[in-house]
Amino acid sequence: MTIRVGINGFGRIGRNYFRALLEQGADIEIVAVNDLGDTATTAHLLKYDTILGRLKAEVTHTADTITVDGKTIKVFSERNPADIPWGELNVDIVIESTGIFTKKADAEKHIAGGAKKVLISAPASDEDITIVLGVNEDKYDPAKHNVISNASCTTNCVAPMAKVLDENFGIVKGLMTTIHAYTNDQRILDFPHKDLRRARAAAENIIPTTTGAAKATALVLPQLKGKMDGISMRVPVPTGSATDLVVEVSREVTKDEVNAAFKKAAEGELQGYLSYTEDPIVSSDIVGDPSSCTFDSAMTMVMEGTSVKILGWYDNEWGYSNRLVDLTVFVGNQL
């Protein structure tokens, strides 16, 4: 069954999602997009992308549509999600990727408008469930979970790392630092922002800021509640990030044991989500990688047997958008 999808918010994640489903060949039809920009801009930014390059498709537009390789997509410009006529278009799933309507009460407006499910491309509030594929999708109940969060790109990276460590060695506590590409929430040049660090020029500074990714890991691995925390360091790259995770484990381990556990997981139950490399890679090497996390085995450290430091890379846009496509298929196949 082809899954009929509407996208609310055609920014970085909305457009990456569109490209990812085309590349995957997923059985998903985008029937409508809602975005406050005009269609000329929407079409142009879909066709041309600084990071991903030019879309290998013909893209045209009218006042209220964009057409990609002959497939016409309706474009709305509604500020209130309740005003988007998803029901008239028989939309199954809405991708809520504005970054604004992350509360359940707001996201549910899409369901009031006729959609069956809403997938939020961000951490959410009061959502029915947060899912990180490869970690907790077995908890999904289609009968009662209608507003679903895909968590954050960083949680999608750190949760598989934490899962492997906890299942194999037991996590006592942990601290995480994500070395994260800058995003549209930052400033190109110094300009006011509620976070005074993010008010500083993104391409000229290493910027410490907050992240809820470590704590959010407990949403998908409840046994880790209260055991993990972390910070983010925003760095001057447009995409390509890394998570540095330091944990105390419950028994003595070696570097080889840790690496072996990750290699086994990457080739087994987490295949497609967790990748494993022994190559000396850097951030640009991860751009365009669809994995949630690429485990860098050369960077593993163990001190005094129980203190473990590991590193996982992720394309914070492309990897995350591929998981959003996968989650659409996962949820859509159970409608």
Swiss-Prot record:
The keyword ATP-binding does not apply. Catalyzes the oxidative phosphorylation of glyceraldehyde 3-phosphate (G3P) to 1,3-bisphosphoglycerate (BPG) using the cofactor NAD. The first reaction step involves the formation of a hemiacetal intermediate between G3P and a cysteine residue, and this hemiacetal intermediate is then oxidized to a thioester, with concomitant reduction of NAD to NADH. The reduced NADH is then exchanged with the second NAD, and the thioester is attacked by a nucleophilic inorganic phosphate to produce BPG. The active site is at C153. One of its GO terms (biological process) is glycolytic process. Keywords: Cytoplasm, Glycolysis, NAD, Nucleotide-binding, Oxidoreductase. This is Glyceraldehyde-3-phosphate dehydrogenase 2. NAD(+) binds at R12, I13, D35, R79, S121, N184, N316. Belongs to the glyceraldehyde-3-phosphate dehydrogenase family. It catalyses: D-glyceraldehyde 3-phosphate + phosphate + NAD(+) = (2R)-3-phospho-glyceroyl phosphate + NADH + H(+). It comes from the Bacteria. Pathway: Carbohydrate degradation; glycolysis; pyruvate from D-glyceraldehyde 3-phosphate: step 1/5. Inhibited by pentalenolactone. InterPro entries: GlycerAld/Erythrose_P_DH, GlycerAld_3-P_DH_cat, GlycerAld_3-P_DH_NAD(P)-bd, Glyceraldehyde-3-P_DH_1, NAD(P)-bd_dom_sf. SUPFAM superfamilies: Glyceraldehyde-3-phosphate dehydrogenase-like, C-terminal domain, NAD(P)-binding Rossmann-fold domains. One of its GO terms (molecular function) is NAD binding. Homotetramer. It holds the Pfam family Gp_dh_N. Its EC number is 1.2.1.12. Its main location: cytoplasm. It comes from Streptomyces avermitilis (strain ATCC 31267 / DSM 46492 / JCM 5070 / NBRC 14893 / NCIMB 12804 / NRRL 8165 / MA-4680). The keyword Repeat does not apply.
